[in-house]
Amino acid sequence: MAFSLQLQQIFVSYTRFCSQPKSITNPLISLKLPSIHPLAFAQNAAVSNIDTGVAAIDGSAEEVSLPPQLRRELMPKHVALIMDGNRRWAKMRGLPVALGYEAGIRAVRKIIELCGNWGIMVLTLFAFSSDNWLRPKVEVDILMSLFERALNDELENFAREGIRISIIGDSSKLPKSLQDLIAKAVKTTKENSRLHLVVAVNYSGQHDVVQACQTIAQKVKDDIIETKDINSFLIEQELQTNCIDFPCPDLLIRTSGELRLSNFLLWQLAYSELFFSHSHWPDFGEAEFLEALCSFQQRQRRYGRQSS
């Protein structure tokens, strides 16, 4: 992804980001979600296939064409993304960090469009880790402002295109205006079923497991359940991903060549297939996503069983 920016525009944009982190109005990059194809596979037209971990298609559902490299019966139901490399992408181009994050929003837009059109039912994005509060305040402010602006700009489109929004993580530490917008987005889109977009903000996989255990312990203390009732299914029901029909990703993609999970969906990724891309997130587009999906479709998911 390339930018044609005059030097003056870069510094003007950077000044605007740093001086007004709560109200970014940079027009250089806009997040406008293209319409998802009306014949795209809808979530409620699929039947879960537990053995293969892919979506079985209801024959009555009209389908949009897939790239010839992909097989529809092997498409993952749930894709999770660790979107890494925005800052490095900007640094390589001599641009402010803020413009790297702006470019990352464009990549998000494209992946949402592809998921909706290719029949992926859940897309989970790791937008902000609980550890990211350790970054410089100006960068955190930029991230919060970008998230708020993008969500506000796209909420109407999400509602129209059948995209359901859910947020996981501790939202209590987010700016009040962002908390209010999140509540509005969740309420507005709760009946949508074409694509479930889950955004992890101020999220920690370890904390998710801890809070689930605390909730279960309290239920035991209150005589709601007994210790013998505790199993993996019960724990999963108390995780923050309990809002998702398919809470465990079939495929995790991480960009920018980093080979770690970074405290993301630690319980849910137990049997997920992993794909690591060397592309920085702003450069991750259709070709890179297609490569990841092709790799996924060539694998045999055994869930601890012998290979066939």
UniProtKB/Swiss-Prot annotation:
Residues 1-45 form a transit peptide. GO terms for molecular function: magnesium ion binding; prenyltransferase activity. The keyword Transit peptide applies. The keyword Lipoprotein does not apply. GO terms for cellular component: chloroplast; chloroplast stroma. It is found in: Plastid, Chloroplast. GO terms for biological process: plastid membrane organization; polyprenol biosynthetic process; response to cold. Its main location: plastid. Widely expressed. Its cofactor is Mg(2+). Its EC number is 2.5.1.-. Pfam families: Prenyltransf (PF01255). The active site is at D84. Gene3D superfamilies: Decaprenyl diphosphate synthase-like. Keywords: Chloroplast, Magnesium, Metal-binding, Plastid, Transferase, Transit peptide. Belongs to the UPP synthase family. Uses neryl diphosphate and geranyl diphosphate to catalyze the cis-prenyl chain elongation and produce polyprenyl diphosphate with a chain of 55 carbons. This is Cis-prenyltransferase 4, chloroplastic. It comes from Solanum lycopersicum (Tomato).
